[in-house]
Amino acid sequence: MVMSDPIADLLTRIRNANVVRHEVVEVPSSNIKKAIANIMLTEGYIRDLEEYRDGSVDMLRISMKYGQNKERIITGLKRISKPGLRVYCRKDETPKVLNGLGVAVVSTSKGIVTDREARKLGVGGEVLCYIW
């Protein structure tokens, strides 16, 4: 099956696993998915990230992170730029999610970075998603 929006698929799988409090979620791997998952790991939204090969398909195993009483660390994931409607921002228009409490993932000429890194680098780009 051909996937029209692999980023939305990644976010939906993580969102669904988060709602039912699964420990691990597995998704097909790609460079952009790895970059988004690495941002989630460095920002503290997931516990661990592992890449493995399942037959002929590269997969990502994402270990979800929860609080002491299984409360969710990720409260929201939202896809912003979609295949049917791309959303871009200039370097001075980089969005803030919940006044800096969340993270906007931006695809720039310097790679896929957070909104804070994009402001620090002085670059704009395509706003992929919000995580809070």
From Swiss-Prot:
Keywords: Ribonucleoprotein, Ribosomal protein, RNA-binding, rRNA-binding. PROSITE patterns: RIBOSOMAL_S8 (PS00053). One of its GO terms (biological process) is translation. GO terms for cellular component: ribonucleoprotein complex; ribosome. GO terms for molecular function: rRNA binding; structural constituent of ribosome. It holds the Pfam family Ribosomal_S8. SUPFAM superfamilies: Ribosomal protein S8. Belongs to the universal ribosomal protein uS8 family. Part of the 30S ribosomal subunit. Contacts proteins S5 and S12. One of the primary rRNA binding proteins, it binds directly to 16S rRNA central domain where it helps coordinate assembly of the platform of the 30S subunit. This is Small ribosomal subunit protein uS8. It comes from Clostridium botulinum (strain 657 / Type Ba4). The lineage of its organism: Bacteria, Bacillati, Bacillota, Clostridia, Eubacteriales. The gene is rpsH.
